[in-house]
Amino acid sequence: MINSILVVCIGNICRSPTGERLLKAALPERKIASAGLKAMVGGSADETASIVANEHGVSLQDHVAQQLTADMCRDSDLILVMEKKHIDLVCRINPSVRGKTMLFGHWINQQEIADPYKKSRDAFEAVYGVLENAAQKWVNALSR
């Protein structure tokens, strides 16, 4: 059974904290965290990401960005990344986790989720919609 899920993006301030919170809301009994491949360590969630998430009832208020580590990878049952190239980057940190590293967009046709950082509000809205859809598909798959 998958009890711990790690959501990964680059900076851990836009996509992964949003994905983490969406999964946490739907799967409160599971341990869900997020981290970044090149995290803005100690930073809070991006302001626009926070505003957009909040408007959809998801709070990123107390998020603190953290750097992905080999131990985090080892201790997670499932690692969800935003882009295909992130799979290789995660595996450079801990090569043993390849079999449990998948795209967050796996259930929506292996869709990659673009980074909205420093882009328009519309970009953040679009990314939120994709994350929400993908998270629901993961919830459905993990609840079987």
UniProtKB/Swiss-Prot annotation:
SMART domains: LMWPc
UniProt keyword annotations, A-Z: Exopolysaccharide synthesis, Hydrolase, Protein phosphatase, Virulence
Enzyme class, first EC level, given as a word: hydrolase
Catalytic activities: O-phospho-L-tyrosyl-[protein] + H2O = L-tyrosyl-[protein] + phosphate
A GO term for molecular function: protein tyrosine phosphatase activity
Keyword Chloroplast: no
Disulfide bridge map: none
Database matches in InterPro entries: LMW_PTPase (IPR050438), Ptyr_pPase (IPR023485), Ptyr_pPase_sf (IPR036196), Tyr_phospatase_low_mol_wt (IPR017867)
Thylakoid listed as a keyword: no
Gene Ontology biological process terms in this record: polysaccharide biosynthetic process
Enzyme Commission identifier(s): 3.1.3.48
Record: active site: C9, R15, D115
Known function: May function as a phosphatase required for amylovoran (an exopolysaccharide that functions as a virulence factor) production.
Family: Belongs to the low molecular weight phosphotyrosine protein phosphatase family.
Name of the protein in its database record: Probable low molecular weight protein-tyrosine-phosphatase AmsI
Protein's gene: amsI
